[in-house]
Amino acid sequence: YTINKVSFITDYNVLQASTQNSIEVNDSLHYKGFPIYYKDKLYLRPKVLTNNLRITPGTLYNEQNVQRTYSNYGRLQALKYTNIRFFEVQQSDSAKLNAYVMLTRGKHQSVSFEVEGTNSAGDLGAAASVAFQHRNMFKGSETFMFKLRGAYEAVSGLQSSLNQDYIELGAEATINFPRFMFPFVSSDFKRRIRATTEFGLQYNYQMRPEFTRIVASAGWSYKWGVQQQRSQHRIDLLDINYLYMPSIDQTFKEDYLEKDENYILKYNYEDRFIVRTGYSYIYNSAGRALMNNSGIGNSYTIRLNFESAGNLLYAVAKLGGMKKNASGEYTLLNIPFAQYLKGDFDFAKNLVIDNRNSLAFHFGAGIAIPYGNATMLPFEKRYFSGGANSVRGWSVRNLGPGSFPGDNNVMNQSGDIKLDASIEYRTRLFWKFRGALFVDAGNIWTIRDYKDQPGG
């Protein structure tokens, strides 16, 4: 069969598919030879409809192109359902098909609320957030999200000149475009890559008895998937984080930060820029079976992650002959910036024995190297061991680095290298109960001999 004509119906009612009311058309237009029928107002730009179409008039019918079209429209958050129907052209000796792309509009705007209570060692608190989401911001299925969050916790046992309780306020805004956006790139390339582009801003204000901290960030990233959703890629083209410490309690500073043995802790309570780029890759052999919650069977997952920070800033500072501060660091707007390389690898495999028993294997490794403008990693980029997702015989952040036993007074059990491995036998017991036997192995280490982490 040859494709004769392709038409769009944007207000298809899938719940009334068997009745005449399933298609309501009050108006129409033609765009680049494609008829577009709609009810009251066209909620998607015609260019968005045609750019995601892979069924071309005058070409042979191709099932792969039909599935690609379904996949493209499935990525548009403004749509709820997509149905493509083909009808033979009623002509003698004709082998032509008319295609109708029938789209069902989704809910474009929503507001959500969340409330939670906390109890940290007897200190009670509460948190609340409100989020607004618009899934068709500029009539191109762009998803805009804005979120506000607030938290409060009564902190006992600490005397401070700053504040006696914990208060947190945060705001977040992101916008996601269902297409690849970059200057000087051809339209044909943008159509082929099928990536989404995301821009985001975040602001977080924290007030504790020990300190006041502000974290602000901005990001620009791309995401796309291939091979029937088995592979997923993400590129963080630019991710800027700014850590600002406007005030630190004098007692906390004297007891912890000004001691030579707490160099790692002091480093993480200083103002700092982190300007990074990164790439991550996920491969899941289950593919769409995992998304559809259907029987998965034997499967495995591979995760790779690589990121670097500070290299461009360091090169500019070096070539520009900029002066270093008293700590021997180059600065951006008088604020030191981090510089490091970090890579992670993770492999997990699920082996089904029968409908009640299975084996799970896991291996993970990571290394992060501070260099150039930094002698240490930022706290958020260091590795931790112990807890439910690591070596389960230790509490979270309570193992390592190396043979270092840790200090209960400060959170200095972190490192630059991490290895984790486990094997687990899982079985169904009865009703909703499951059982498991597992063996875990792993630890973290430091690349350098830090004096406040002997044996690390």
Regions found by a protein language model. Name each.
Residues 1-119, 188, 366:
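Periplasmic polypeptide-binding modules associated with outer-membrane biogenesis and secretion
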Residues 11-15, 22-24, 37-44, 51-54, ...:
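Transmembrane beta-strand segments of outer-membrane beta-barrel domains in Gram-negative
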Residues 116-122, 131, 221:
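A short, surface-exposed beta-strand/turn
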Residues 3-8, 105-121, 144-148, 196-203, ...:
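Transmembrane beta-strand segments of Gram-negative outer membrane beta-barrel proteins
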Residues 8, 13-15, 91, 106-108, ...:
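Generic "edge-of-domain/loop-turn" microfeature
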Residues 70, 85-89, 99-101, 116-118, ...:
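Generic recognition of flexible, low-complexity loop/linker segments
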Residues 52, 125-136, 141-178, 189, ...:
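C-terminal transmembrane beta-barrel domains of outer membrane proteins
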